[in-house]
């Protein structure tokens, strides 16, 4: 069994995964969304303190598995340095107490393996990763064989939702709030520009779209509930159209036989529907992680760690450090 820990941002989570068949034997997550909502975003120092409180409580619930643990896995990159450290400190303590190896896991690779929780990995795949901090198209051939085909030049898909929600006074996190509000709106009322529409480069950019929403808001007075819904719907439509356009371009270039979308923002139902329709047209199979595993969680870290364990890809204690910004390259 592998005990895995996730604390890269504002979710405290621990999981126990059986190595031989990937079975998830224990999984618990404590979200900090409510604590950060009044600040309009994650406050690193507060997040760190809340992890320090939550992780030991979760570990106490999983203590029956400790005698059977063969390795300790922990997210060590990328993320907020002060929150990553909370998970790393617990992992090192367990490593010393149980005398089992450590596995440092890249959080983004964890998102890829959220597709394969409790099952064998089916690769290669082209994977679109959409989250609060990242927007990437990946060519995934294996745990240690991942190539970045495209990334964002500025804001990520999820980050743009958070920032637009903050502009509109809708609170944090912005993704679910914008999505819910958009269901009541007219997505054609505001003609927000699709970023990089005519650009040849394979890249994403959300800063221009975000600024277009800011301009529209500044030009309106006494916004009604319907105005807010229309802005949310129009913004969401343009944001997804940009993802779709650049992913279609990647498919034309790389011709994948299999496609998947992962990350917290992949829980957006409008996004899922748009990509399901496009993949159906192209006869390309599409996969998503289960909704419960889209956002940050230790189950995906544990599943990725099984791959590392089977490759004897362990991390020395002194080398296990927090790496706030990283990638696969």
Curated annotation (Swiss-Prot):
Source taxon at top rank: Bacteria
Keyword Signal: no
GO biological process, one term: tRNA threonylcarbamoyladenosine modification
Compartments in which it is found: Cytoplasm
Family statement drawn from the similarity comment of this UniProt entry: Belongs to the KAE1 / TsaD family.
Annotated positions binding substrate: 129-133, 162, 175, 268
Function: Required for the formation of a threonylcarbamoyl group on adenosine at position 37 (t(6)A37) in tRNAs that read codons beginning with adenine. Is involved in the transfer of the threonylcarbamoyl moiety of threonylcarbamoyl-AMP (TC-AMP) to the N6 group of A37, together with TsaE and TsaB. TsaD likely plays a direct catalytic role in this reaction.
Source lineage: Bacteria, Pseudomonadati, Campylobacterota, Epsilonproteobacteria, Nautiliales
Gene of this entry: tsaD
Reactions accelerated catalytically: L-threonylcarbamoyladenylate + adenosine(37) in tRNA = N(6)-L-threonylcarbamoyladenosine(37) in tRNA + AMP + H(+)
Protein name: tRNA N6-adenosine threonylcarbamoyltransferase
GO molecular function: iron ion binding; N(6)-L-threonylcarbamoyladenine synthase activity
Cofactor note: Binds 1 Fe(2+) ion per subunit.
ATP-binding listed as a keyword: no
Cofactor(s) required for function per UniProt: Fe(2+)
Gene3D superfamilies: 3.30.420.40
Taxonomic source organism: Nitratiruptor sp. (strain SB155-2)
Keywords: Acyltransferase, Cytoplasm, Iron, Metal-binding, Transferase, tRNA processing
Any single GO CC term annotated in Swiss-Prot or TrEMBL for this entry: cytoplasm
Record-linked PROSITE patterns: GLYCOPROTEASE
Class of the enzyme per the UniProt entry, highest EC level: transferase
Binding site for Fe cation: 107, 111, 296
InterPro entries associated with the record: ATPase_NBD (IPR043129), Gcp-like_dom (IPR000905), KAE1/TsaD (IPR017861), Peptidase_M22_CS (IPR017860), TsaD (IPR022450)
